[in-house]
Amino acid sequence: MDAAELRATQAPIKERYKADPNAALITLKAKGSIDAEGIACKVETGRALAVAGLHPATGGSGLELCSGDMLLEALVACAGVTLKSVATAIELPLKTGIVSAEGDLDFRGTLGVDKEAPVGFREIRLRFDVDTAAPQDKLDLLLKLTERYCVVYQTIRSGPKVSVTMQRV
């Protein structure tokens, strides 16, 4: 897809959202079932069933997916799609690119070993390695716009309001 195709595809969508801001509000959903036997949660991905379990650093076997890894994978996926979309829109040719994310966790927090240890990532690093002949000012713009428009990056960075409920079934 080139810049013209991208604009043509998105123009009517953007116009609809400008005319009716409520049309832009969409609720995305995820659902998982708690495994009756093991310590795992089966997440419906729409394509397959992803089984998440304990990370080996917390006693897991390593056979199931780690939800921390899944968070980083979601960040990489969203950032990669956003980067490519922005590059296309600003007509910055990319030959190839690699998106990587890594994050630091102190597992004492989630295991309740140390009440002062944080539960969750202390730091996340997102990196783009791109093969392009574009000038540095265009790369700076690409990075700035990718950060601005990446949903997962902005969600992690901004920390939205989150509510948690529980009910009997």
Located regions from the model:
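Extended beta-strand/beta-hairpin segments
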Residues: M1-E73, S85-V169
